[in-house]
């Protein structure tokens, strides 16, 4: 993000406790964000629920709130601090969910707080399984056959259309695949999909055809504002 002279105070959301899908790398990235913004003259307010982190050291931010990472708590802090912007991209899935919730319910507009780093459209398109599938299709990127569902009735209706079992259940807006899994029969499908809908922040699961037996190759790519890109690591599963 280029320097913005119209912004004076920024709230940064931490990632909370270390757990599967959201580990120490977010403490490191959050710490670097605090340092970079303060070095550039911004007033930094950090909200994090985990006191045992580097970013909670007193010199990291102008003010630090060790509070539960919940939308209503973050809103109360912003009402008190009156920041110009909210930075959620350094806090992992938890922070992105909070930012999306505050944007969708109108809280950010009400408080005059701008979401910086990741905009709302990018968060929705990356986390909403149906929107992500449509984005991939629009750019002619091959994807597995899948159907977005928000009820068990829709889940059961998707079985024949997707060619039968096994099927993969992918909840939207969850951390580390929480509530997802592979179903080999109707009973497993209902059980897993019910949990997925329950855990999803928007009550949605994507029912996807299985590609068991395929190899997975993952590339971590960093890209800057000038569209320069570099592959920093590769993985094979």
PLM region spans:
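N-terminal beta-alpha lobe that positions the nucleotide/phosphoryl donor
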Residues: 1-237
């Amino acid at each position: 993000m280029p320097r913005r002279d119209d912004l004076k105070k920024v709230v940064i959301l931490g990632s909370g406790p270390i757990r599967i899908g959201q580990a120490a790398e977010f403490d490191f990235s959050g710490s670097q964000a605090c340092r970079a913004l303060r070095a550039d003259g911004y007033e930094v307010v950090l909200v994090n629920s985990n006191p045992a982190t580097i970013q909670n050291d007193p010199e990291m931010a102008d003010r630090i709130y060790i509070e539960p990472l919940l939308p209503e708590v973050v809103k109360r802090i912003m009402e008190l601090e009156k920041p110009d912007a909210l930075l959620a991209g350094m806090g992992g899935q938890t922070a992105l969910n909070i930012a999306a919730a505050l944007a969708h319910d109108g809280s950010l507009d009400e408080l005059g707080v701008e979401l910086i780093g990741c905009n709302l459209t990018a968060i929705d398109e990356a986390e909403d399984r149906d929107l992500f599938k449509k984005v991939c299709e629009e750019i002619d990127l091959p994807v597995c056959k899948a159907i977005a569902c928000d009820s068990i009735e829709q889940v059961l209706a998707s079985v024949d259309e997707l060619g039968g079992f096994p099927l993969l259940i992918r909840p939207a807006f969850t951390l580390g695949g929480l509530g997802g899994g592979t179903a080999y029969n109707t009973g497993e499908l209902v059980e897993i999909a019910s949990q997925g809908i329950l855990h999803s922040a928007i009550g949605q699961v994507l029912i996807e055809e299985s590609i068991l037996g395929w190899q997975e190759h993952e590339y971590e790519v960093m890209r800057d504002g000038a569209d320069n890109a570099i592959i920093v690591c590769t993985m094979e599963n």
